[in-house]
From Swiss-Prot:
MF terms in GO: adenylylsulfate kinase activity; ATP binding
Binding site for ATP: 39-46
Function: Catalyzes the synthesis of activated sulfate.
Reactions catalysed, as given in the entry: adenosine 5'-phosphosulfate + ATP = 3'-phosphoadenylyl sulfate + ADP + H(+)
Alphabetic keyword roster: ATP-binding, Kinase, Nucleotide-binding, Phosphoprotein, Transferase
Pfam families linked: APS_kinase
Organism expressing this protein natively: Vibrio vulnificus (strain YJ016)
Protein name stated in the entry: Adenylyl-sulfate kinase
Entry's family note: Belongs to the APS kinase family.
């Protein structure tokens, strides 16, 4: 199903809240951020993001994980997998992540998001430094070996069209904030690296 973007109504204006984004973040003792995990299917995006959320929750930080499969059960259930619908899927998630960051949360998103232009679209929604692109750098070979959903096998057999990495291009991030060697290190080591980066960037502080 294709998405339809309504024209903006000039009578619709942004309502300023009495409680500010800074106040919400201060109450949580953290800095709002959107960690955008991108990579091939099977790269480990959801696994790493979930492990990071567990670690942050254990330390008392306020987070929310947006997963590619989960949002298609509700917010994006009307969208298919055409180029237009995939773009709209990312646009909606970007807007949702922006609202969650405005609430003072550390937002983790796990989406293939194969195109640089769409990732840039989300980056442009947020203040400088708030969008943290995390490239889950796992080779196609390793992803195919894992193939947890059997999708690569189906794509190779021609049962799935326009599958990213097989017959649809994945545009590797040119300058991600974090290049995560997910094909080389274990989950705990990757989470340690991410926590270190978040601390260096001032998103979190030791507790």
């Amino acid at each position: 199903m294709s998405s339809v973007i309504a024209q903006k109504d000039e009578n619709v204006v942004w309502h300023q809240h009495a409680v500010t984004k800074t106040q919400r973040a201060d109450l949580k003792q953290q800095k709002p951020a959107v960690l955008w995990f991108t990579g091939l299917s099977g790269a480990g995006k959801s696994t790493v993001a979930g492990a990071l959320e567990n670690r942050l929750a254990e330390q008392g930080f306020h987070t929310y994980l947006l997963d590619g499969d989960n949002v298609r059960h509700g917010l994006c259930s009307d969208l298919g997998f055409s180029t237009q619908d995939r773009r709209e899927n990312i646009r909606r998630i970007g807007e949702l992540a922006k609202l969650m960051a405005d609430a003072g949360l550390i937002v983790l998103t796990a989406f293939i998001s194969p195109h640089r232009a769409e990732r840039q679209l989300v980056r442009d929604l947020l203040p400088e430094g708030e969008f943290i692109e995390v490239f889950v750098n796992t080779s196609l070979e390793v992803c195919e070996q894992r193939d947890p959903k059997g999708l690569y096998k189906k794509a190779r057999a021609g049962e799935i069209a326009n599958f990213t990495g097989i017959d649809s291009e994945y545009e590797v991030p040119l300058n991600p904030e974090i290049d995560l060697p997910a094909g080389e290190k274990g989950i705990e080591a990757l989470v340690d690296l991410l926590v270190e980066q978040l601390t260096l960037r001032g998103v979190i502080s030791p507790r």
